[in-house]
Amino acid sequence: FTSAAALGMIFCVLTGFAWSWLLFLILFVVTKICYSASLTIYDSMLGDITTEDRMDEVSSNGFAWGYLGSCIPFLIALIAYVLGPDMVGLIPALLSRGIGVFVTAAWWLMVTVPLLLGYTQKNYSSGESASVGAAFRKIFGTLRHIALHDKKVLFFLIAFFLYIDGVGTIIDNCINIGTDLGLNTVGQVLVLLATQVVAWVFSLVFARLSQRHSTVRLLTVCIVGYLCVCLYALTLQNLIQFGLMAFGVGMFQGSIQSLSRSYFSKIIPPEHAGEYFGLYDIFCKGASFLGSGVIAAVKFAGGTINIAIGLLALFFLAGLILLRVADRVNQSVWQLEGL
């Protein structure tokens, strides 16, 4: 975790000094890889820091305050962009870009240090090789075990892949809808910022609801909410309607991610959380290519992005069905030794 985060911060800062688009792209990809690698380990920490009955609440609070906190570097970077040559022109492009990436890296460091000082790993497998090859063998062995012996986790991962694919596709293409309706660059960023704030509020709401309702019930609400957002996208004609859609996305954006993480933590063996969450993040980060394929196919056929977003309702419907199936499957006995 520490190595991935440290490298990510370094490469994040270096993107601000890239002198060509190719170098910037390479540095950005490396930064993203390091960020994703650190998140895989970060997600697996949930079982170490709380009890099963509080996982939903803790996970939801984590996403909530993460969304709110991210608004701070977001705003600073936005101000730097506005002051840059593309808008006001008070500061040069290099300084404008440099402020954005430096503040992002500094924020990343600031929120990582308390975790490093306060976290103690409790659940782990002893006596295992720490090599990269051994780690990949472990992950593939875990995948084989899930496919053959753990249908609950298998059905959930497939469900998660489908509905989180829909979530990622909507988030990635929401701005495209706004652009088609006449939203400029600053307006796009402000909509994203407002969505973060809405996600903060409703993640806290779902954190409170998790004390009284089951994880699957709350996940069902989130999935149905996104399904309704997809259908509502079919009617979009102006920026007011787009704002309502963005509000709907924000309502469930943090909660569907936090509750998925906490539910997964509950159904996996704690001592193998690392490799299980490796698979979880593969399903998560690998998602959105199906949705992107739908977007591309619809646009190629002459349709609008509104229709494409509407078709994503099928992803949420299928994900919801498989989630309910997973919830009805009995918990498997974990026997992973020797993988």
Protein language model features and the residues they cover:
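Structural signature of the two symmetry-related core transmembrane helices
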Residues: F1-V13, R217-Y232
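Helix-loop junctions at membrane interfaces in 12-TM secondary transporters
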Residues: L14-F28, L234-M245
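Glycine-rich segments within core transmembrane alpha-helices of 12-TM secondary carriers
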Residues: S59-Y81, D281-G291
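A membrane-interface helix-boundary motif in multi-pass transporters
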Residues: A80-A106, A297-F316
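Multi-pass alpha-helical transporter architecture, strongest
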Residues: W107-G118, G310-L339
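Juxtamembrane intracellular "pre-TM" segments in multi-pass secondary transporters
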Residues: Q121-L157
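Short amphipathic helix-loop junctions that connect adjacent transmembrane helices
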Residues: D172-Q188
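Helix-to-loop junctions at the C-terminal end of transmembrane segments
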Residues: V201-T215, K299
